[in-house]
Amino acid sequence: MTVASTVSQEILNHCLAIEGQRRLQGVLKVSGAKNSALVLMTASLLTEELVELINVPNLTDIAGMGRILSALGVQVEHSGNGVALNAGNLTSHEPPYELVNSLRASFFCIGSLLGRLGHARVPLPGGCRIGARPVVEHIRGLKALGAHVSVEHGIVSACVKGSKKRLTGAPIVLDCPSVGATETLLMAAVLATGTTTIENAAHEPEVQDLANLLIQMGADISGAGGPVITIHGVERLAGVSNYPVIPDRIEAGTFLIAAAITRSPLRVEPVIPEHLSAVLQKLRDCGCQLEIDQTGISITPGDIQAVDITTQPFPGFPTDLQAPFMALMATAQGTSVISEKIYENRLQHVAELQRMGASIRVDGSTAIVEGVAQLSAAPVTGSDLRAAAAMVLAGLAANGTTKVSGLKHLYRGYDKVEAKLNAVGAQLERQQG
């Protein structure tokens, strides 16, 4: 199955049956980063030339982005783990609502369309329903660059007045280091006249990956990965061949937690350790031995002890690994305190872990987890992407066969997850729900 393929509607009626307490051994391969690949695909809108990406994961979200870009007139061709995008003949500046509604990353199109064409109409985004996740910062930044922006009936309309249809560089100070706003404004600014600075910019590796791609395309960008990004606008961008998407740090972290929760020695590769520093430290703190080299990480779990975590913007502990790490802490010795500081309403997985025997109580955006000796198999549902991953991890550790529903969420972010885990000794089988 190629990245052009989408997982069948059959997954809505299926579940994953997971036989727990199997010891794992071997190497888990990490795919390209979903959150990077999605925004890199939208960057293809900034040039009339061919953009080729490699190490692209095979996910429903990637297929969805391909459909959105195709609807705008982009020629999208998938081959293996590569995707070629040619936006030389755009036919629309408004992605269809029915496609955008299911994918939050679709909103990135507004920055690249506005930068290239001088106008765009983009529906407010969909995706996992985690808290408010507003786009206020994106819009405020686009206005600072000279765009006229209005929101009506769920559609964001933006345009640049004047004959040249080009944005104008400006200083922008974000109220918070939003990844989405940073990436949207970065793409909008690369073709603007003059110089743009983005202060309080997001530091995430995915932002750095986008900047690196744009630089290879001819953009003049400095400071990506730090608090201030400077963009000197250029007249045009060129294409790029075989640009590799960075490894998915969230998938890598999930696999390391899979080793810890099953008390199994595993190797996870490829990994860029600097992208997971906070997670690696917490794994060490809770009793795991890590050996890190240039290509990956070997993990040997010991007796897992409770540790506290607080989600923070990069380089802090990532919110996307909060639910998976909570599953691990549910099996630890002692009591851990897990505080979610990035998104509201991101503790929906607690009730499902409790169904499996986890001892957890919630106080606002904080969960207090008292480790238990054994989780028990139960029918559970992943309410969002990372909650679904947490259910899979809990199922790997539980006594009995756990059935996890909500696979439409899981396949949005984990490439060939059953095959990868089964290859190291797990037993996962998709069944009729």
From Swiss-Prot:
<feature type="binding site">
    <location>
        <position position="320"/>
    </location>
    <ligand>
        <name>UDP-N-acetyl-alpha-D-glucosamine</name>
    </ligand>
</feature>
<dbReference type="GO" id="GO:0009252">
    <property type="term" value="P:peptidoglycan biosynthetic process"/>
</dbReference>
<dbReference type="Pfam" id="PF00275">
    <property type="entry name" value="EPSP_synthase"/>
</dbReference>
<keyword id="KW-0670">Pyruvate</keyword>
<feature type="active site" description="Proton donor">
    <location>
        <position position="128"/>
    </location>
</feature>
<dbReference type="InterPro" id="IPR005750">
    <property type="entry name" value="UDP_GlcNAc_COvinyl_MurA"/>
</dbReference>
<dbReference type="GO" id="GO:0051301">
    <property type="term" value="P:cell division"/>
</dbReference>
<comment type="function">
    <text>Cell wall formation. Adds enolpyruvyl to UDP-N-acetylglucosamine.</text>
</comment>
<keyword id="KW-0961">Cell wall biogenesis/degradation</keyword>
<dbReference type="InterPro" id="IPR013792">
    <property type="entry name" value="RNA3'P_cycl/enolpyr_Trfase_a/b"/>
</dbReference>
<keyword id="KW-0132">Cell division</keyword>
<feature type="modified residue" description="2-(S-cysteinyl)pyruvic acid O-phosphothioketal">
    <location>
        <position position="128"/>
    </location>
</feature>
<dbReference type="InterPro" id="IPR036968">
    <property type="entry name" value="Enolpyruvate_Tfrase_sf"/>
</dbReference>
<comment type="pathway">
    <text>Cell wall biogenesis; peptidoglycan biosynthesis.</text>
</comment>
<feature type="binding site">
    <location>
        <begin position="34"/>
        <end position="35"/>
    </location>
    <ligand>
        <name>phosphoenolpyruvate</name>
    </ligand>
</feature>
<keyword id="KW-0133">Cell shape</keyword>
<dbReference type="InterPro" id="IPR050068">
    <property type="entry name" value="MurA_subfamily"/>
</dbReference>
<feature type="binding site">
    <location>
        <position position="342"/>
    </location>
    <ligand>
        <name>UDP-N-acetyl-alpha-D-glucosamine</name>
    </ligand>
</feature>
<keyword id="KW-0808">Transferase</keyword>
<feature type="binding site">
    <location>
        <position position="104"/>
    </location>
    <ligand>
        <name>UDP-N-acetyl-alpha-D-glucosamine</name>
    </ligand>
</feature>
<keyword id="KW-0573">Peptidoglycan synthesis</keyword>
<protein>
    <recommendedName>
        <fullName>UDP-N-acetylglucosamine 1-carboxyvinyltransferase</fullName>
        <ecNumber>2.5.1.7</ecNumber>
    </recommendedName>
</protein>
<dbReference type="GO" id="GO:0008360">
    <property type="term" value="P:regulation of cell shape"/>
</dbReference>
<dbReference type="GO" id="GO:0071555">
    <property type="term" value="P:cell wall organization"/>
</dbReference>
<dbReference type="GO" id="GO:0005737">
    <property type="term" value="C:cytoplasm"/>
</dbReference>
<keyword id="KW-0131">Cell cycle</keyword>
<keyword id="KW-0963">Cytoplasm</keyword>
<dbReference type="GO" id="GO:0008760">
    <property type="term" value="F:UDP-N-acetylglucosamine 1-carboxyvinyltransferase activity"/>
</dbReference>
<dbReference type="GO" id="GO:0019277">
    <property type="term" value="P:UDP-N-acetylgalactosamine biosynthetic process"/>
</dbReference>
<comment type="similarity">
    <text>Belongs to the EPSP synthase family. MurA subfamily.</text>
</comment>
<dbReference type="InterPro" id="IPR001986">
    <property type="entry name" value="Enolpyruvate_Tfrase_dom"/>
</dbReference>
